[in-house]
Amino acid sequence: KSVAVIGGGTMGTGIAGLCAQTDHKVLLLDVSEEAIQKAKDRIINGRPPAVDDPKKAGNITFGTIDNDLALVANYDWICEAVVEDLPTKRALFEKLEPLRRKGSVISTNTSGIPLRDITEGMPDSLKKDIAVTHFFNPVKAMRLLELIPGEQTSPDVMNALSAFIGTQLGKGVVHAKDTVNFIGNRIGCFWMMTGLHYAQEAVDDGIPMEQIDALMSSPMGLPPTGLYGLIDLIGLDVMDLVGKNLAINLPAGDKGLDFIALPGPIHKMLERGQIGRKAGAGFYRMQKLDDGSRKTEIFDLLDGDWRASEKFQLDDAHA
């Protein structure tokens, strides 16, 4: 009946918004008042907003981790959605475990860090009550939810999470094993990372980025955003963390190791903070003109500068 979400970034606000939209009591915590203000704005004004009805945001109570973490004792499900960093997640769970009430369930929204690494050395009381609930972005639009148990996760916890997420939140729950990047990201991130590398070769050969996005979208059964637009939605910072996670966990000889680092020009974007929609600019950005209209610009990886984005017709493609 109630959900505490810890982490007010893209995924945390998405999860909190979905729960609020379905009329559940929600607590959303982040590291600072400034972060909470950004989370509030993201819930109402994000692209897309986390709630369809702005009034539903009234179901959310906001607070900071330092001041309000003890409030989790009042909530049935505690969902961690902080940065994709193992030490950060472990430190949070160490603080969280003594505060939650008996009978509550816990989950981590990690997109690929094995649960066994997160819970190593933690109390058995936590290990039996925790699972991975891997939502996909944007949370309210993506039906897929991966649910992953640890070695000691109670069947009752798995059943409770599966029932709530499937019936109350309307997700299609896929049960996966506790392996690196699980199922969706093990396939999808390999596609995206290899795509960035091969697309960079095409860009260097003079192929427009819009043509690459047009081809690597609906014709391949993929989102209409295309490759670059999809990564703008996910965030280059997330892609970089996924690559680092793969570097640690993939076995020697795995083909994925050839593509885990971002191509040079794209890594420079990451260093500048040009990481995607949540930063206001990634491969694409929206510019407001003097007459109030908007135009889409694309960051040309060949020239290293912004230019107007051109609509590419697939009929114009050449072999």
Which residues fall in each region the model found?
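N-terminal glycine-rich phosphate-binding loop for ADP-containing cofactors
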Residues: 1-319
